[in-house]
Amino acid sequence: AEEVHDLSGDKPKLYKDYRELLEKEKPEIVIISTPDHWHALQTIAAARAGAHVFVEKPTGHTIQESRAMVNATRDSGKTIQVGLHRRIGPHHVSGMEFLRSGKVGKVGMVRMFVAGAGGAEKPRPNSEPPEGMDWDMYCGPAPLRPFNSRIHPGGFRHFLDFANGTLGDWGVHWLDQVLWWTEEKYPRRVYSTGGRP
């Protein structure tokens, strides 16, 4: 809030609970960029409160959550958009145009690979959450567990209570691009390996 105030002169109201924000502010549009395990509940609540929703990928923690999100926005008559930045990046769009032009010839198979840092890490001891952080609210619909700095800030994607790992984080982008290009609704086969010892 202080940074926004320094840049604009306006100081936004702060809320610790999204439900209070929805009730008091009655926003027309909500942007959800919270950890993945909150996406479904917050999207459904925002749609039911009368807001259009832009939600970062992945939509939900499970297929059932994602379906519930779609149903809630349909029932409310509001629009939901999922944040997939590779749909709008100029090099991705031009690459898609090239692939669809037929200039690459007949494509018989598509494979995607995602590689990244991984492997064993030294465990960090649990600790108290940072001052001012409501750890119970952060955990929300996930099982309450002790705070650990491997989870927050930024590491939540490696913990399945909060996200779906690398496949749910980066795999969403790669799978979406192939489905976008091929105009298929679903992959025919998915095989994934990985993990931490």
Task: Give residue spans per PLM region.
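N-terminal Rossmann-like dinucleotide-binding module
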Residues: 1-9, 86-89, 99, 178
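N-terminal glycine-/serine-/threonine-rich beta1-alpha1-beta2 phosphate-ribose binding loop
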Residues: 1-55, 61-79
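Local beta-strand N-terminus motif with an aromatic residue
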Residues: 27-30, 104-107, 187
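Residues that line or immediately flank small-molecule/substrate-binding pockets and catalytic motifs
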Residues: 34, 111-114, 142, 194
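A structural signal for well-ordered alpha-helical segments within the folded catalytic domains
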Residues: 40, 44, 67, 89-93, ...
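A contiguous active-site-proximal alpha/beta segment in oxidoreductase catalytic domains
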Residues: 52-54, 59-137
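Rossmann-like dinucleotide-binding domain that binds NAD(P)(H)
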Residues: 136-197
